[in-house]
Amino acid sequence: MISPFVLRRTKNEVLKDLPDKIENTVLVDFSEDEKKLYLAHLAEANQLLKTLDGSKDRIQILAMLTKLRQICCEPRIVFDDVKHMSSKMEACLNIIQTYKDNNKKIIVFSSFKSLLNLLAKELDKSKTSYYMLTGDTDKADRKGLVDAYQNDDTTVFLISLKAGGTGLNLTAAEGVIHFDPWWNMSAQNQATDRAYRIGQKNKVFVYKLIMADSIEEKIQTLQAAKKDLADRFVEGNSGSITTMSGEEIMSLFSED
């Protein structure tokens, strides 16, 4: 009698069968008005920090971090009186236009549904075809959207990181944009793997959009210096920064 056995392939073995994955960090400069807005709210956050207990007031600190992130991404999702497109939005649209011009597909991931809604409006203006999947998308519609994107000529798939960062097969895409990279590197990698997986026949280009001289760039620096921080931070979890030291938290709000 022959004993049964299970053949498993490690991820590294699978990667050998895939085309290259090219990862790019795209540093975007603030406009003059954006820089003034960002620095004003950074100063406000630092004033508030002086009144908080870093070990107890983590929810308020997380709220300040989130607001600064949103200002980096697109001030229009925070302030009704801001009318101009953000520098990061412009950079994202430029990348998308390149893919559209070359008849290639690209996915955009964001943690913020409001940002995806705004991006969708910009795509409408340029008559760029897209699908969108967020937490509001019915489960019954998810498969239909994926199948359509895999087989039709739609250029862009806008996806909420929390709603669609796992469980989707989108190998028709050759590009992935992370609009607002954050602590959770494993979540970002899983999202990238919606395109970079078995069945992918082309190189996949990954773009992380980062505002220069901002909280986003500080986060990237901390990630590089201390990769285990990425595993401590989970999006949407109010207790996600409880394991960070006060010094680590304060470094995010420094103005240098």
Feature roles, as predicted:
Residues M1-N12, Q200:
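Conserved P-loop NTPase motor "coupling/switch" region that bridges the ATPase
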Residues I2, L68, Q223:
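A residue-level signal for conserved active-site and pocket-lining positions in enzyme catalytic cores
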Residues E13-L39, L52-L168, G239-D256:
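Conserved Helicase C-terminal RecA-like lobe
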Residues V14-A43, D141, V156-S240, M244:
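SF2 helicase/translocase ATPase core recognition
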Residues E44-K50:
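Cytochrome P450 catalytic domain signature, combining two hallmark sequence patches
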Residues A45, L229-A230, E248-I249, F253:
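Generic structural signal of hydrophobic/aromatic residues within well-ordered alpha-helices
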